[in-house]
Amino acid sequence: MEPARHIYEQWHQAAKNRDTAALIALYADDAELESPLVPVILGRDSGILRGHAEILAFLEEGSSRRPNELVRWYRDGRYLAAGKLLVWEYPRQTPDGSQVDILELMELDDDGKIRRHRIYWGWF
């Protein structure tokens, strides 16, 4: 399986299932994650996390605060992979109502791990 498809499938499944061990295994040791939720969840000034320890703390705390209705984890099965870049969307409209519109943007390293992960939010 191509690395982009592997990340697309495995990241989504692990996130839905709150499997933080499986999630962090998809990231390179020196990965960066940027999200507007970082300051809210971790009480930091910056929205950028670096390395497994910081990213795992965010994933664990974020997972423990669910469930909520902002994300229904609906995707339409489409993603864009160009070289080492991977992009997909959780669209606003779902078959069961609406969810927050999220765009996942990831850069993969030579080993197929997530090197940089940026999360962009729409409105909710």
Name the predicted role of every residue range.
Residues 6, 70-72, 98-100:
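Short solvent-exposed loop/turn micro-motifs enriched in small/polar/acidic residues
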Residues 85, 99-124:
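Short beta-strand edge/turn micro-motifs at domain boundaries
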Residues 29, 95, 110:
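Short, ordered coil/turn segments that flank beta-strands lining enzyme active or ligand-binding pockets
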Residues 87-95:
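Short beta-strand segments that buttress and anchor functional surface loops
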Residues 2, 28-80:
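A solvent-exposed, acidic/Ser-Thr-rich amphipathic alpha-helical stretch
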Residues 1-29:
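Short, low-complexity N-terminal intrinsically disordered segments enriched in polar/charged residues
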Residues 23, 31, 51, 55, ...:
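Hydrophobic pocket/interface hotspot
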